[in-house]
Amino acid sequence: MKYKEPFGVKLDFETGIIENAKKSVRRLSDMKGYFIDEEAWKKMVEEGDPVVYEVYAIEQEEKEGDLNFATTVLYPGKVGNEFFMTKGHYHSKIDRAEVYFALKGKGGMLLQTPEGEARFIEMEPGTIVYVPPYWAHRTINTGDKPFIFLALYPADAGHDYGTIAEKGFSKIVVEENGKVVVKDNPKWRM
């Protein structure tokens, strides 16, 4: 039997960059329809189209039993009063779980069942979040510095971004009077 070769890579805890990783960049223009204040979104895109987040992924073949891992650097910012966030997703194989480790900065994870039941878990360096099977999840930067975290997930989990792009999350995370507030999403579709 031919065994897969073990390997090690370096993670820079200051920058969130994993050596030899595949880099993906999401700009605000890549997130049309994700934020409530569409006018503020349009203005920010026209005035510079900021990078919202970067992902550095080490991926394996999509097969059962293997693991992928990735870091995300989620930049601080708001569209209107809604904090910068990742697109969010279910897993294509919805019965797959995931684990997130907060490394730097301040933020949180918004999780949701297919029926719209939602939870928000605050994250700071050292926080580990378990995402159970069947829960959609997105991370949100509620601070003023980059929020960096590491995710570990089954290589065959896949990403279903389409359901979130179409329906959204049932809750949004905004700043009101200097506080982080989780509110009902007026655009959410069951």
UniProtKB/Swiss-Prot annotation:
GO BP, one annotated term: gluconeogenesis
Entries under SUPFAM superfamilies matching the protein: RmlC-like cupins (SSF51182)
Main location: cytoplasm
UniProt KW keywords: Cytoplasm, Gluconeogenesis, Glycolysis, Iron, Isomerase, Metal-binding
Enzyme class label: isomerase
Short name of any one Pfam family annotated for the protein: GPI
Catalytic activity annotation: alpha-D-glucose 6-phosphate = beta-D-fructose 6-phosphate
UniProt pathway annotation: Carbohydrate degradation; glycolysis; D-glyceraldehyde 3-phosphate and glycerone phosphate from D-glucose: step 2/4
Gene3D superfamilies associated with the record: Jelly Rolls (2.60.120.10)
Name used for this protein in its record: Glucose-6-phosphate isomerase
